[in-house]
């Protein structure tokens, strides 16, 4: 995800070379003499399908907000300084494509395109078709390796040297590409199916989880709550008593019921509701259409990319704020004195101590990185286009007054 190329066109050239080398090299040197004519024709038809899916992943636009887009009540009013337009929920400005992208997942250097609302199905189909094709090639090359092993006692002149050299070269190359694609596909599908998130939203959730115990995060959330609901944030209570038991310091001298605490003591990061997770089936259908359309080139998302269906848990969400709840920015805090005492109780609770000492606690959204070292910049987000100082919530009172 963090790959950035000096010449972006190389990002398309490299996959084309690898696909052509594996697909046609395997056919010319190995399959031509080991598969029937029908099998070879079907194989080449499938290779054409892979090329078509890759072409669509490159050329299909991910989608951009309409001109003069107006956010609804309860949504973030986020202005793009470069597009001179408001951004819908889940949208970001891509620094490479130089435009706002609907439901931006990431900018993919290997397709020279953003993966977003409209072309995510094409991207997933390309990766899926590539995995199936690579699996078949690996299977056939593996059969040849077994054949060479069984023929190891035969005279060497009975073995096709060109074919053997091709197998020795193509097998590790194909395996390397296969493993790389599998990792990417599994990561995308886990986030899409089981969490309903884009790669950027997963990063945002990790950021909020990392800074969940900090006052600067909760000062901003309290400010946002008052802006949207017109009242102070109530006392928050966790739905997961087991998680709360382990996350809250048992030896804390603070009263958990004290609402004057800036950071809620009875609330955990698991209690933050991600509004767009509708369940495995609905997540896949909304992103890629019904199952019988998943492998077809015209299968696409069922939503418009401007407004998204929220899950039923939003009715029980104690914060009642749009995603992300801090709006992507937080209240500034005074510099923390590095020379502080650590109590015995803190030494006994190492996870809490590590969170407290994590240097990412006081990082801004543009600086923060996850455990893999990824920042928003690595996903292609143009932070210079964001007008954080003027981002605001659209309250119901504003809509009614207008």
Curated annotation (Swiss-Prot):
Origin superkingdom: Eukaryota
Keyword Transmembrane helix: yes
Record GO terms (molecular function): protein-cysteine S-palmitoyltransferase activity
Stretches assigned to the DHHC domain: 78-128
Compartment(s) of residence: Endoplasmic reticulum membrane
Predominant cellular place of this UniProt entry's protein: endoplasmic reticulum
Keyword Translocase applies: no
Catalysed reaction, written as an equation: L-cysteinyl-[protein] + hexadecanoyl-CoA = S-hexadecanoyl-L-cysteinyl-[protein] + CoA
Matching Pfam families: DHHC (PF01529)
Transmembrane segments: 9-29, 40-60, 126-146, 166-186
The entry's keywords: Acyltransferase, Endoplasmic reticulum, Lipoprotein, Membrane, Palmitate, Transferase, Transmembrane, Transmembrane helix
Membrane-related topology note: Multi-pass membrane protein
Ranges facing Cytoplasmic side: 1-8, 61-125, 187-402
Record PROSITE patterns: DHHC (PS50216)
Enzyme class: transferase
InterPro entries assigned to the protein according to its UniProt record, in alphabetical order: Palmitoyltrfase_DHHC, PFA4, PFA4/ZDH16/20/ERF2-like
GO CC terms, sorted: endoplasmic reticulum membrane
Annotated catalytic residues: 108
Domain topic, free-text comment: The DHHC domain is required for palmitoyltransferase activity.
Family label: Belongs to the DHHC palmitoyltransferase family. PFA4 subfamily.
Function: Mediates the reversible addition of palmitate to target proteins, thereby regulating their membrane association and biological function.
Protein name: Palmitoyltransferase PFA4
Taxonomic source organism: Debaryomyces hansenii (strain ATCC 36239 / CBS 767 / BCRC 21394 / JCM 1990 / NBRC 0083 / IGC 2968) (Yeast)
């Amino acid at each position: 995800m963090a790959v950035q190329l000096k010449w972006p066109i190389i990002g398309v050239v490299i996959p084309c070379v690898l696909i052509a080398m594996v697909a046609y090299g395997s056919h010319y040197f190995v399959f031509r003499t080991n598969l029937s004519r029908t099998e070879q024709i079907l194989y080449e038809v499938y290779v054409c399908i892979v090329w078509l899916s890759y072409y669509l992943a490159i050329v299909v636009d991910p989608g951009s907000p309409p001109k003069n887009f107006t956010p609804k009540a309860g949504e973030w009013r986020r202005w793009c300084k470069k597009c001179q337009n408001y951004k819908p929920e889940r949208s970001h400005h891509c620094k490479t494509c130089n435009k706002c992208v609907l439901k931006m997942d990431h900018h993919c250097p290997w397709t020279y395109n953003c993966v977003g609302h409209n072309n995510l199905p094409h991207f997933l189909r390309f990766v899926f078709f590539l995995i199936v094709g690579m699996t078949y090639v690996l299977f056939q090359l593996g059969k040849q390796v077994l054949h060479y092993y069984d023929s190891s006692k035969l005279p060497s002149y009975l073995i096709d040297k060109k074919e053997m050299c091709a197998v020795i070269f193509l097998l590790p190359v194909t395996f390397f590409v296969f493993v790389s694609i599998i990792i990417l596909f599994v990561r995308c599908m886990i986030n899409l199916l089981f969490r309903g998130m884009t790669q950027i939203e997963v990063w945002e959730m990790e950021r909020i989880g990392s800074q969940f115990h900090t006052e600067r995060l909760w000062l901003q959330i309290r400010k946002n709550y008052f802006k949207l609901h017109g009242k102070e944030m109530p006392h928050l209570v966790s739905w997961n008593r087991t998680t709360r038991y382990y996350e809250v310091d048992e030896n804390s001298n603070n009263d958990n019921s004290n609402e004057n605490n800036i950071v809620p003591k009875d609330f955990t990061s698991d209690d933050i509701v991600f509004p767009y997770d509708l369940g495995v089936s609905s997540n896949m259908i909304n992103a890629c259409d019904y199952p019988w359309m998943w492998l077809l080139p015209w299968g696409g998302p069922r939503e418009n990319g401007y407004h998204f269906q929220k899950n039923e848990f939003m009715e029980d969400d104690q914060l009642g704020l749009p995603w992300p709840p801090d709006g992507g920015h937080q209240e500034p805090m005074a510099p923390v004195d590095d020379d502080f005492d650590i109590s015995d109780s803190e030494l006994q609770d190492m996870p809490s101590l590590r969170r407290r000492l994590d240097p990412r606690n006081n990082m801004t959204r543009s600086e923060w990185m996850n455990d893999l070292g990824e920042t928003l910049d690595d996903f292609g987000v143009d932070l210079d286009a964001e007008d954080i100082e003027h981002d605001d919530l659209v309250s119901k009172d504003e809509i009614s007054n207008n």
